[in-house]
Design a protein with these regions (language model features):
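Bacterial Sec-dependent N-terminal signal peptides
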Residues: 2-8, 13-48
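Short coil/turn segments that connect the beta-strands within blades of beta-propeller domains
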Residues: 45-46, 101, 140, 188
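Short loop/turn segments that connect beta-strands within beta-propeller blades
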Residues: 69, 117-120, 164-167
């Protein structure tokens, strides 16, 4: 009887030990770094947003904010500014830009672009774009480069999506090269840097098209 009891005590101890060693997901709570001693604001800007990528597959992209007037740094502000949304911003923050009064964030592996108020970081909506990468703006439009295909899938030709900044709707798209990255709009032309795909057989290149629908190149 004692031998059986000792056996089950050992088994229970092993199970408790295994449970204690399990790697639980880390919850990222908002926190702040206080104003440094002797801080003096020498910038003309009110603040600076920082989009933290987070580990791929962990759904831990976060948005931080540096208040330039006080020097206070606030981490992971998005959940508290948007209590009605899921706690995490998404998976893999890849690009962030302020255009007009809006804050645009590319959340790569969540396949979307999150749009918020630049003044408050309160969400205004989102745009679904597969494997989105980078942003560029011109007039009333946002341009988003996209790998299109999944990370672990075969390489496919990428695309550039044009988004109406007022309605947050995709109204045009254009096929470009493999794995398009950053873009520039110069003299009415949209230049797209294509990294060339995951295969060494697919060389990188620079393409240009017209951001204007009247030329029929972005359709």
């Amino acid at each position: 009887m004692r031998r059986n009891l000792s056996f089950w005590i050992i088994v229970l101890a092993i199970l408790v030990g295994l449970a204690a060693c399990r790697n639980d997901d880390v919850v990222l709570y908002p926190d702040e770094t206080p104003t440094p001693d002797g801080y003096t604001n020498t910038s003309s800007y009110r603040g600076l947003y920082v989009l933290c990528e987070g580990n791929m597959g962990s759904n831990k992209a976060t948005l931080d904010y540096l208040d330039m007037t006080t020097g206070r740094y606030s981490r992971n502000i998005y959940p508290s500014r948007n209590p009605g949304k899921v706690m995490e911003l998404g998976d893999v923050g890849n690009d962030i830009k302020v255009y007009g009064s809006r804050l645009w964030m590319v959340i790569n592996q969540s396949n979307r672009v999150e749009v918020a108020s630049a003044a408050s970081a309160v969400s205004l909506g989102s745009v679904d774009i597969p494997n989105a990468r980078f942003l560029a703006f011109d007039g009333k439009y946002a341009y988003v480069s996209s790998y299109v295909g999944p990370v672990n899938g075969p390489s496919v030709l990428g695309e550039v999506y044009r988004v109406d900044t007022l309605t947050l709707r995709v109204d045009a798209r254009c096929t470009v090269g493999f794995q398009p990255e950053e873009m520039a709009i110069v003299d009415g032309r949209l230049y797209v840097a294509n990294s060339g795909g995951y295969s060494a057989m697919q060389g990188g290149c620079l393409l240009y098209t017209s951001p204007s629908p009247r030329d029929g190149l972005l359709s």
